């Protein structure tokens, strides 16, 4: 279970060089097997609730770093586990206070955008979390950022 990422490089001719212009990032998320969950666990599951799943960082200065906080709450009846996390951009930094939340517990996830790295990736910045919530085993926080023109 977890997330695996790699890059595939395409070439049209023999001798083509590997570079960002012919790179295709590939990621695979293997979700937890919830088929062996007990009756009690299936009737009392953990439930993840995020304060936001879309963040916007408008009008950043070219070398600016700016942060926002997403609250993660377990509104379910058993412990919530954030089992894996993948950050899909070198422009993002993520700090998560806790990976296991008891029922009713909340933690903070701080997401920082580094404006100088925004243009370096082809994919849209996002954070993918793998959880033991049977209804949301995979949850994504999307990030939009724009840089002011000088």
Language-model-detected regions and their locations in the chain:
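Long, low-complexity ectodomains and other extracytoplasmic segments of secretory-pathway proteins
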Residues: 11-71, 75-76, 134-150
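Short strand-edge motifs at loop-to-beta-strand transitions and within beta-strands
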Residues: 55, 105-111
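Short hairpin/turn module used for nucleic-acid contact or packing/dimerization
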Residues: 111, 127-128, 136, 140
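Long, contiguous C-terminal modules that act as interaction/assembly or targeting platforms
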Residues: 100-101, 110, 140-143
